[in-house]
Regions:
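Glycine-rich phosphate/pyrophosphate-binding loop and the adjoining helix
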Residues: 69-124
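Helix-loop-strand module that forms the ligand-binding subsite of alpha/beta enzymes
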Residues: 1-67
Length: 124
């Protein structure tokens, strides 16, 4: 469940410079389960690679006590990276960016662990 996870990687497309409505709805619906956890974004879209969508949702994350990390993987013109078999094939640069994102997310997750422990003690 969301409550049991320590960090999240949100993957979102960009619709008119905003994230997917389903992402915003999930964030709002599970309000109490997000607190004191790190979050990262992999976004995709046209020329911006979905970066506007990721930036637009970050204020909501902070209101929910999620910590969005600065690293992000933005995949521009993503349809060019889908093979005939339907498999997504990232560029080498995108794969390296994803590795860096996950490493940084792990650091933030560890740094926020004391806050999660304190919050669970306060609730229990």
């Amino acid at each position: 469940t969301v409550a049991r996870a320590d960090a999240f990687v949100f993957v979102t497309p960009e619709y008119n410079a905003f994230p997917a409505p389903s992402l915003v709805n999930a964030l709002d619906h599970l309000y109490h389960e997000w607190g004191h956890k790190a979050a990262a974004f992999v976004s995709y879209g046209g020329s911006s690679g979905g970066m506007r969508a990721a930036q637009a949702v970050k204020p909501l994350l902070t209101a929910l006590q999620l910590m969005p990390i600065p690293q992000q993987v933005a995949i521009a013109s993503f349809t060019r990276l889908i093979g005939e078999d339907g498999t997504f094939r990232p560029t080498d640069a995108q794969a390296r960016a994803a590795d860096r994102l996950l490493a940084e997310l792990a650091r933030w997750t560890a740094a926020l662990a004391p806050l999660r422990r304190a919050a669970s003690t306060d609730e229990g």
